[in-house]
Amino acid sequence: MAELYYDNQADLNRLKHKPIAIIGFGSQGHAHARNLADSGLDVRVGLYPGSKSWAKVEEAGLKVMTVAEAAREAQIVMILTPDIGQAELYREHIAPAMEPGKTLMFAHGFNIRFGQIVPPAGIDVSMVAPKAPGHRVREVFVQGGGVPALIAVEQDATGGAFEDALAYAKGLGCTRAGVLRTTFAEETETDLFGEQVVLCGGVSALVKAAFETLVEAGYQPEVAYFECMHELKLIVDLFYQGGLNYMRYSVSDTAEWGDYTAGPKIITEQTRAAMRQILADIQSGAFAEDWIEENHNGRPRFNAYRQADINHPIEQIGRELRRMMPFVNPREVKPGEGGA
């Protein structure tokens, strides 16, 4: 059974006299820094000199300094920059300040799980991973609630690593909802698997393949877009609110019957075998090795994949149709922009 922890099991006073450095001020960094500060903790934000976020931190009324300065001042250092780049950042700016008794924290276990960051033996290494994007972590906290989080300890040099991580989660507001104990390996492997098989890779490939099937059969691309892309949100929202059962309660009996009869034809034993292989590649480190090498080589395949999908007909049609629907709050990525 999962171990769950709540507000009454976390002691925020453990961190009252432990300066905290938040490294990065993106989606999660912004939320962590502001929530912890509002919880009465001593927070500073570490950024590269000249970072575009420097002024934003100052506008938020928080202390801002270089990464190295923040790491030196802090007892707890939370790294909230993109996975690729963390190892170099750690080696050059954080590692020199990690004296025995300090804590190194993460919100995702990639660099610890795959050996890109190897902390010294004398420090605590833990993780607090809110299960929501940063803006939602902040929004729910301000409303008096919290989002669930995962918590893990990789290295407990002081004997209090878990209790400190739990207190940190309380500072974010996460123990108001509930915090689930896990391990760095479990969080990392399941997170990558979910992204690849369902949330990003699986859904994207399914949507494109279904769209292409309809268009090749002679149906209008606009109609195919509505059926295969646009309406997906309606179903996902039902999943989000009440799971598979609530979705099936909410759709027509015809749709539910098609769910039962057609779904297994899409997710076949061959599909499941591919899922198992993807998981094996994650567990063995093959995926991480490939991704790290891709970045070292300047991302040629990554950029080619991205450009190919930008030019896919479903994206061309989608841009036009979303202009008809201002109520969906359309967004467009400008050339050269990309995710973290």
Swiss-Prot record:
Pathway membership: Amino-acid biosynthesis; L-isoleucine biosynthesis; L-isoleucine from 2-oxobutanoate: step 2/4; Amino-acid biosynthesis; L-valine biosynthesis; L-valine from pyruvate: step 2/4
Residues annotated as the enzyme's active site: 108
Positions annotated to bind Mg(2+) 2: 191, 227, 231
Positions that bind substrate: 252
Cofactor note: Binds 2 magnesium ions per subunit.
Pfam families cross-referenced by the UniProt entry: KARI_C, KARI_N
One Gene Ontology CC term in the entry: cytosol
Single Gene Ontology MF annotation: NADP binding
Binding-site positions, Mg(2+) 1: 191, 195
Enzyme class, first EC level, given as a word: oxidoreductase
InterPro entries registered for this protein in UniProt: 6-PGluconate_DH-like_C_sf, KARI, KARI_C, KARI_N, KARI_prok, NAD(P)-bd_dom_sf
Catalytic reactions on record: (2R)-2,3-dihydroxy-3-methylbutanoate + NADP(+) = (2S)-2-acetolactate + NADPH + H(+); (2R,3R)-2,3-dihydroxy-3-methylpentanoate + NADP(+) = (S)-2-ethyl-2-hydroxy-3-oxobutanoate + NADPH + H(+)
Binding site for NADP(+): 25-28, 51, 53, 83-86, 134
Cofactor: Mg(2+)
Residues of the KARI N-terminal Rossmann domain: 2-182
Enzyme Commission identifier(s): 1.1.1.86
Biological process, per Gene Ontology: isoleucine biosynthetic process; L-valine biosynthetic process
Origin superkingdom: Bacteria
UniProt cross-references to SUPFAM superfamilies, sorted A to Z: 6-phosphogluconate dehydrogenase C-terminal domain-like (SSF48179), NAD(P)-binding Rossmann-fold domains (SSF51735)
Keywords from the named record: Amino-acid biosynthesis, Branched-chain amino acid biosynthesis, Magnesium, Metal-binding, NADP, Oxidoreductase
Membership in a protein family: Belongs to the ketol-acid reductoisomerase family.
Functional summary from the UniProt entry: Involved in the biosynthesis of branched-chain amino acids (BCAA). Catalyzes an alkyl-migration followed by a ketol-acid reduction of (S)-2-acetolactate (S2AL) to yield (R)-2,3-dihydroxy-isovalerate. In the isomerase reaction, S2AL is rearranged via a Mg-dependent methyl migration to produce 3-hydroxy-3-methyl-2-ketobutyrate (HMKB). In the reductase reaction, this 2-ketoacid undergoes a metal-dependent reduction by NADPH to yield (R)-2,3-dihydroxy-isovalerate.
Protein name: Ketol-acid reductoisomerase (NADP(+))
Protein's organism: Chloroflexus aggregans (strain MD-66 / DSM 9485)
